[in-house]
């Protein structure tokens, strides 16, 4: 299928930014939910990248879930002229959130284990 170059570029840029694309299986939908192009163009462009091994596809409940592979990151980086330091959001490692630590008090009084036996 012939997809206009500017639409293909929008799809590839969004895929590289996010690392994941979700598309509803509705070929007649006039516009994709997140990318400013037709839904059919998104599905077919990502289907092409899947056949080349740049994207992994999962289908569930009438939605396509496309995930970028390592080869896909390199391919899009060369195609879109993106420097080495920039990665998709799914590839960035976030610092683990600090969990609140419980207070270390003495032994608990009362309760199930603290009952005196008669």
Curated annotation (Swiss-Prot):
Q: Which GO terms describe its cellular component?
A: cell surface; cytosolic small ribosomal subunit
Q: Which InterPro entries match?
A: Plectin_eS10_N, Ribosomal_eS10, WH-like_DNA-bd_sf
Does the keyword Ribonucleoprotein belong to this entry? yes
Record's keyword terms, sorted:
Cytoplasm, Ribonucleoprotein, Ribosomal protein
The segments labelled Disordered in the record are 91-118
What is an example of a GO molecular function annotated in this UniProt entry?
Answer: RNA binding
Q: Does the keyword Zinc-finger apply?
A: no
Which portions of the chain have biased composition (kind: Basic residues)?
106-118
- Record localization: Cytoplasm
Q: Which Pfam families match?
A: S10_plectin
Principal localization reads: cytoplasm
Q: How does it assemble?
A: Component of the small ribosomal subunit. Mature ribosomes consist of a small (40S) and a large (60S) subunit. The 40S subunit contains about 32 different proteins and 1 molecule of RNA (18S). The 60S subunit contains 45 different proteins and 3 molecules of RNA (25S, 5.8S and 5S).
Report the sequence similarity comment from the record: Belongs to the eukaryotic ribosomal protein eS10 family.
Could you tell me what this protein does?
Answer: Component of the ribosome, a large ribonucleoprotein complex responsible for the synthesis of proteins in the cell. The small ribosomal subunit (SSU) binds messenger RNAs (mRNAs) and translates the encoded message by selecting cognate aminoacyl-transfer RNA (tRNA) molecules. The large subunit (LSU) contains the ribosomal catalytic site termed the peptidyl transferase center (PTC), which catalyzes the formation of peptide bonds, thereby polymerizing the amino acids delivered by tRNAs into a polypeptide chain.
Name-wise, this protein is Small ribosomal subunit protein eS10
Give the lineage: Eukaryota, Fungi, Dikarya, Ascomycota, Saccharomycotina
């Amino acid at each position: 299928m012939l997809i206009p170059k500017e639409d293909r570029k929008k799809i590839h840029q969004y895929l590289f930014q996010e690392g994941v694309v979700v598309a509803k299986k509705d070929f007649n939908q006039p516009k994709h939910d997140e990318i400013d192009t037709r839904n059919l163009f998104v599905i077919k462009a990502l289907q092409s990248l899947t056949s080349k091994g740049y994207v992994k596809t999962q289908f569930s409940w009438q939605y396509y879930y496309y995930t970028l592979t390592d080869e896909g990151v390199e391919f899009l980086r060369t195609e879109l002229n993106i420097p080495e330091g920039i990665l998709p959001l799914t590839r960035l490692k976030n610092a683990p959130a600090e969990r609140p630590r419980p207070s270390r008090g003495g032994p608990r009084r009362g309760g199930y284990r603290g009952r005196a036996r008669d």
